A protein has these predicted regions:
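Glycine-rich, low-complexity intrinsically disordered segments
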Residues: 1-120
Length: 120
């Protein structure tokens, strides 16, 4: 079973980019109660390696819906805005409920690319 990941984003200039992204107005029938101000992340790729000279962080790539944060992310990349990003990882516990078990926090992050892909 795959992980469930929610993203919260705050921009230095725009403020809360993820505010309202988990609502039915933003995502339609994909909204989840309790996650109204978070962005549902379909996939996440995190690459860190050690070459013997220290650790190197190669960024995080994530996939999300087109929602109300999409134009704000475009503004962010256009203005080279610093971002605070938090990725919350959830799993199903032994009682059948979601529990947060892992967190990745990025401070002073910048977007380097945005790709829109529509698959038929």
């Amino acid at each position: 079973m795959s992980n469930i990941v929610y993203l919260t984003v705050t921009g230095e200039q725009q403020g809360s980019i993820s505010a309202g992204c988990g609502t039915s107005e933003s995502t339609g029938n994909r909204w989840q109660s309790g996650h109204e101000d978070e962005i549902f992340t379909f996939s996440l790729l995190n690459n860190i390696n050690n070459t013997g000279l220290g650790s190197q962080f190669h960024g995080i790539t994530f996939c999300k819906l087109i929602d109300k944060s999409t134009p704000l992310f475009i503004n962010s990349i256009n203005n080279n805005e610093q971002l605070f990003m938090g990725f919350d990882f959830y799993r199903i516990n032994r009682f059948g409920r979601l529990e947060k078990y892992y967190y990745i926090q990025l401070r002073g992050a910048f977007l380097s690319a945005i790709h829109h892909q529509i698959i038929e």
